[in-house]
Regions:
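Hydrophobic, aromatic-enriched interface-forming segments
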Residues: 65-123
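Outer-membrane beta-barrel translocator domains and adjoining extracellular loop/strand segments
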Residues: 38-45, 105-111, 153-155
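Short, well-ordered amphipathic alpha-helices
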Residues: 6-14, 76-80, 123-128, 155-160
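Flexible, solvent-exposed coil segments and beta strand-coil junctions
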Residues: 50-61, 103-108, 134-138, 162-166
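Outer membrane beta-barrel transmembrane domains
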Residues: 116-192
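Short loop/turn motifs that connect adjacent beta-strands in outer-membrane beta-barrel proteins
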Residues: 15-23, 83-91, 107, 132-137, ...
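Outer-membrane beta-barrel pore domains and translocons
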Residues: 1, 12, 29-33, 81, ...
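Outer-membrane beta-barrel translocator/channel fold
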Residues: 1-70, 169-192
Length: 192
């Protein structure tokens, strides 16, 4: 079993520039990761007999250092955005880091340090909101994520239409390099 629980907090009060229309959001996240392994559910190679097949009564030499573990996990991030009204283009961008403390996994502690540690994951994203009218924007953006040797980059764009003061409709798509195309449809309801 794998269970995560996190609490996040963000500070949105950093405003600067002309009319205080440039904004910086700072965020932190802390939580726990809990893992539990039921060793009785595993089937090991030593339990297979080429003639009679699987026999759960066969002795095994495999064991875990621990079958249950809970560890602290910490993350943080920052986002900049230009909130200048009536501007033709407003830029935004951010970065976030997960597993900053590189939590250890005691269940596999007899392995090498690289296998025993959850690697740092970081995310970078940015884009520009091109305001075509007071109701319609087109928003191209890029997202890059990396954890250990795994990397993923997506490029996308969507159109946002302001229905009223409370609601925006969005439609667009993303291309994840060397992998997939993902359509996107969304609704943003404010003041719920």
């Amino acid at each position: 079993n794998y269970f995560n629980a996190y609490a996040s907090v963000a500070y949105t009060g950093v405003k600067f520039g002309k009319g205080n229309n440039h904004r910086l959001v700072l965020a932190m996240q802390a939580g726990i990761i809990n893992r539990h392994v039921d060793q009785s559910k595993f089937k090991w190679g030593e339990q297979w007999n080429p003639i009679t097949g699987y026999n759960s009564g066969n002795a095994i030499t495999e064991s875990f250092a621990a079958t249950s573990a809970t560890t602290l996990d910490i993350g943080a991030g920052a986002l900049y955005y230009d909130a200048t009204p009536d501007k033709k283009a407003n830029a935004f961008g951010g970065v976030s880091f997960f597993h900053i403390n590189k939590p250890k996994d005691p269940i596999i502690s007899n392995q090498t340090v690289a296998l025993n540690t959850i690697p740092l994951r970081y995310t970078r994203h940015g884009g520009v909101s091109f305001n075509l009218s007071n109701k319609t924007s087109i928003i191209p953006h890029v997202l890059h994520m990396q954890q250990g040797t795994a990397r993923e980059t997506s490029l996308g764009t969507y159109v946002k239409y302001n229905v009223n003061e409370e609601t925006d409709l969005m439609i667009g798509g993303y291309y994840r390099f060397k992998d997939a195309i993902a359509p996107f449809v969304g609704v943003d309801w404010r003041n719920l």
